């Protein structure tokens, strides 16, 4: 049995790769001792045999066989030849899936700068070299020379830019017989940038910058701090500045940039193959020109074209003219593949599909408790299927998994009863993208509902930043008992009343809820049906309203012995009357109170409306429930 090596890690760090690391990614030594990995030909596949060309972008020797357990020439076939390297074609006999992770590399005939570090915001190359971005660009794209060593020349300084004419003038002086100039060095292109970066002593520069920061202020200080921060990061990560200049380019595995044959015999290919082909063609042409000692101006032009080809491969359109393919469509570069919402990180790595999850539109569930959500039956039976199958077998309704699945597909009544049992006390997690803070994912107790939409309590909407205009939410089922316990104790919606950012309540009524509260408690002098009637209890008043005897906003008299708060103090007796039994009836603005001669209250009727009774009763019921559920001794 093949042993699997487990690797535990806490995080993935993305940094600059050294030239040696790039070579290590692509270079492999075959069991026969041969070293492979360098892609030297721009060809992809042979148009007659439809097999990958050797040393090309789909080379089987570099990336592995195109067919499982079969070499390029066909000498070795079948799994019994596993690990053998064919003597004729040099292809290792292994599985074709290695073509998804084996990389190659292109050894460049001239150094090129990485466009991210040159044209990114901020430009790290210009910050490290302490030069203007425009000047660095002129050097990289062969528009200006830079002084690498002024030697004994008094009119030159380190990192000074020179035009073509200025350099020719200095060159004439340098090579004349009576020249006094010595050790003057001038460079151009990415090689000059690489030399300047190699000469940077990071520790010494950092020390100088710290002294400069202490003695300066304003804009100059901010600029020094910016440069120091970049240098400190390089020191901390152990990366060297010259690694921002590339001498080798990694070639990603061929199955990640495929070429497929269409019905008409034509081929559809990834844009990356075209971009790699441009780089290889220009690189090979440059190597040939250097070999035949071509004039400097031609070599320099080819180096600039190589720089532009590598720029287009890494980030097409970042600088200069965008490289286009058929129909004038811009080619998708490596940056386009990994960046943005549809990129590799957000789409495929962070946004992976997971088991035991579903997704649907949310609608309001006004009758739900704050810790509940309405889960469509169709979704619930799919999410909780393993639990339902286990319960069906345990309760001997079916004898095996196959029979249980058939029962579920038929939608048998017994299945729904079992599902209701399974979801009782089993919380689910609801998540709404984008999850910007921890309240973007909360736990709820599921309630089975008809339809295909998830029902959500309106009070939790602010935490999710959700509304009901077509928003979608994802449902996840915590499987283990530990996950369920965490969901219930830490993530249940009723435990997340306060915002973790501000400490203020995030669960607050809004929109329909505020309007409903206003409508229930509003005054309407036109509502006269049942006005002035007396009711002995809240239930009597609500019954009369439900039967249509009283308007929602009609003023009625309700027997109520509790304290009543009003906007203005209601303690002025408007009228007083002594009744036959000796008791006294006192009439105030908002209430009628009957007292004994000694001043003890016998009864009290308050002036209110059925709407206000509904509002008060709802709040009172909620408070009574809280009092009953709180442990003894805790304040309400």
Curated annotation (Swiss-Prot):
Keyword Transmembrane helix: no
Keywords: DNA-directed RNA polymerase, Magnesium, Metal-binding, Nucleotidyltransferase, Transcription, Transferase, Zinc
Homology family: Belongs to the RNA polymerase beta' chain family. RpoC1 subfamily.
Reaction catalyzed: RNA(n) + a ribonucleoside 5'-triphosphate = RNA(n+1) + diphosphate
Record gene name: rpoC1
Residues holding Zn(2+): 71, 73, 86, 89
Keyword Transferase attributed: yes
Domain of life: Bacteria
One record GO biological process: DNA-templated transcription
List of residues binding Mg(2+): 467, 469, 471
Entry's Gene Ontology cellular component terms: DNA-directed RNA polymerase complex
Free-text function comment from the UniProt entry: DNA-dependent RNA polymerase catalyzes the transcription of DNA into RNA using the four ribonucleoside triphosphates as substrates.
Broadest EC class assigned to this enzyme: transferase
SMART domains: RPOLA_N
Residues spanning the signal sequence: none
This protein's name: DNA-directed RNA polymerase subunit gamma
Organism whose genome encodes this protein: Picosynechococcus sp. (strain ATCC 27264 / PCC 7002 / PR-6)
